[in-house]
Structures are given as structure tokens and as C-alpha cells.
Amino acid sequence: MTEEQTNDIDKLNRQIRNKYIKNIEIWKSLDDNTLYDKYIECPSVKNKINNLKKYLKETNITEEQITNIIKNKAFCLEFLIPPGTKGAVRGNEFNNIIKNKILSFTFLDEDYDIQFEKKCINLATDEIPDFYILNTKLNKAIIGMNQISLIGGGHQTNRASKYILHNKSNDDNKTICLIAEYPKLIKSKNKTYKIFSKGFENNILLYLSDLESIIKEYFKIE
């Protein structure tokens, strides 16, 4: 690796870190321990807990021991709460954080149509966006995709490729992707480097603290 490449990577890592630090409380709010009470309220998890209680009662384990097992947070997180449930709850929580932030922007007046989880007629997307902000006078829109992480593989990586590396933004429509996770240190000019480098350069990949400035810049709001 050349010195120039190393400098580019170091610069990007600092940029990611500086942006993430401003949003660290959001990431903490999406932690398993923070969301635990919401996890165990999910019907699928309640069924697992009830089934476990039933099976344990058929053994010589006492009621007190059963209660202690069920109340063991670490045990439940590892064995009773599926990754899919965690992902769904965490995703919904992240969506709500972003929704509340957008609705708090008083500068988005009656000229703006703000919608959540609806298709935007201005720009066709493969999936329903998490939100869009449409200036009805200018007929310009920001279309938002919320993704806690873009580097976890599978669906996350595909989304990154679609909305960052192959972004279809134009003069009238801008597609952006909001994230929450702090990625592992980037050590080479790999796909993760390309995602963050292009995303930051074009203001299409961002943490929540940058959303207000990007909206104002795009719609030229003073």
C-alpha cells in the first residue's frame, strides 16, 4: 500500500469517527440491553418464554429457579430472542428516532410534504423508502433509506451497493442513507472504504446529526 493510500484511509477513518462521536447516544439507545424490555414484549419471544416455563415445570426445577432463569437477561438475549426479532425491534426504534427528528424541524413548512414508509412518485425505488421530504413548489424530493449498518453483509451490503455506489440522485431528487453503527477500522481500499468515501463525498451517507444541514443545503433553506 502506498503512502498516499494509507493517508486516504487514515483520513476517512478520522472522518467516520468524528461523525459517529456526535451520534454515539443514538447507537447506545439501540443496544440489546437498552431494547431488552421491548424484545420480551414481542409475541414470538413471549411464546418462547412460556414454552420454556412449561418444559421446566416438568422437571425437578423449583418455581423460584424457573423465575430466576427467565429473569436472566443474558440467558434470554442469547437463547430466547432470535436475531431477526432483535433486528426488527432495533430497526423500528431507529426509524422512530429519525422520524421524530424530521418532525421536529420547524423550517419544513407547508411547502413540504413529509411522508414515512410510502413510495415517492418523484423517483422510483426498488423498495418503499423509510421517508421522503417533497418540496411541492419546486417538485424536488429527498428520499431516505434508514439502515443501522451497511457493512454487515447480505441485505445490508446490497443496500449499500444500491443506494451509495449506484445512487440515482439527480437535480430533482436526492436519495440518502442514514446509519447509526460505527464500522470497524478500515484498513484497505475495500468495498467498505468505497461505500463511506463516496457516501460522504456526495452527502448521501450520513449520521443523524448531519441530516438538518443536508436538507437545508439541498432545498436551499437559510
Describe the residue ranges of each PLM region.
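Active-site beta-strand-loop-beta-strand hairpin of nuclease catalytic cores
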Residues: 126-127, 132-143
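Domain-level recognition of nuclease-like catalytic cores that cleave nucleotide substrates
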Residues: 179-222
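Surface-exposed cleft-lining segments at the edges of enzyme active sites
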Residues: 80-88, 114-121, 146-154
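Nuclease-adjacent, charged terminal/linker segments that flank catalytic cores
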Residues: 1-73, 81
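A short acidic/basic microdomain associated with nuclease active sites
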Residues: 103-124
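Structural alpha-beta junctions
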Residues: 104-109, 168-175, 196-210
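Catalytic cores of nucleic-acid endonucleases
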Residues: 147-195
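Solvent-exposed, charged helical/coil patches
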Residues: 78-107
